[in-house]
Regions:
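Short glycine-cluster motifs
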Residues: 28-75
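Catalytic alpha/beta core of large soluble enzyme barrels
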Residues: 36, 40, 62-66, 75-82, ...
Length: 278
């Protein structure tokens, strides 16, 4: 987003892979230095790394700078590794909130965030999006209210150019196959695993089967949560006098009568979860 790249574009895929490669290289280098000082871990001789095979070798992937990797392999063969596993991408919701950034490897779930301070709660619009709109002369109080009424989505706001709408799609608006492909590309440099959340507004047996089969065929060891939404959306949040009028057409006047679990379980395409369908 900061680099103005669409999350599912080839540039984002290349960047994600390069970052993962650098993290893996740095972790191995540090572990090798520790092994030179304190000795390798006791099972190192039984590992594939001792035979010269690192994670990307097991995936059949060629790293970006093979020469430096060969030099690192030589050091590892000489000193070993202090750690048996190096990289695991974990969920970072709490840390991300404290640090004021977004979670881990996920796209943003909305361009609208709720912040809690000692003064109370307030809504905050994605600052990168605000900066982009300001640069193009599109930012105004009316634009802010439109984004808030759309619950953080900008896909239906016609005043916003298509290139911006593409960059600022939310996790619900991105193809999940792209998230899986990003994870698979990172996998060549992750020797433990990664917590990959997937997002689907209306899960069905067909959609889930296709999505998870693609993840399995791509070589993913794990996924994490499947995020879903209730069948009906909650009432829009009002933010000021300009929002005191009636809600947009089609907006429910009250909160959803179903929980996420009920909305999924009551789908005719999900009979296993419904006792009435047994």
């Amino acid at each position: 987003m900061y680099k103005r790249q669409a999350f599912d574009g080839p540039e984002a895929l290349a960047l994600s892979t390069k970052i993962s490669e650098e993290i893996y290289y740095s972790a191995l280098s540090a572990s090798c230095e520790l092994a030179a000082e304190h000795g390798p871990h006791e099972s190192f001789k039984e590992t594939r790394a001792a035979a010269g095979d690192l994670q990307f070798d097991l995936w059949g992937v060629e790293p970006s700078d093979n020469q430096r990797w060969e030099a690192l392999k030589d050091r590892i063969s000489q000193h070993g590794l202090r750690n048996s596993l190096m990289i695991a991408i974990a969920p970072t919701a709490t840390i991300a909130s404290i640090a004021g950034c977004y979670e881990c490897i996920e796209p943003q779930v909305s361009n609208l965030f709720k912040r809690e301070t000692l003064s109370g709660e307030f809504l905050q619009i994605n600052r990168y999006l605000v900066n982009e709109l300001q640069e193009r002369g599109l930012w105004s109080e009316d634009m802010a209210q439109k984004i808030k009424r759309a619950e953080g989505s900008i896909q239906e706001i016609e005043e916003i150019p298509e290139d911006l709408r593409k960059v600022y799609r939310t996790a619900w608006e991105l193809p999940q196959r792209s998230l899986i492909d990003l994870a698979a590309s990172r996998g060549a440099y992750i020797d433990q695993s990664q917590s990959l959340n997937l997002f689907m507004e209306s899960p069905s047996i067909g959609k889930l089967s296709s999505m998870y089969m693609h993840a399995w065929k791509s070589g993913l060891k794990t996924t994490y949560y499947l995020r879903s939404r209730p069948a009906t959306r909650i009432n829009q949040t009002t933010t000021g006098p300009s929002d005191s009028g009636p809600a947009p057409e089609g907006t429910p006047s009250g909160s959803s009568p179903f929980t996420d679990e009920e909305a999924i379980a009551c789908s005719l395409e999900n009979p296993e979860a419904c006792e009435a369908c047994d």
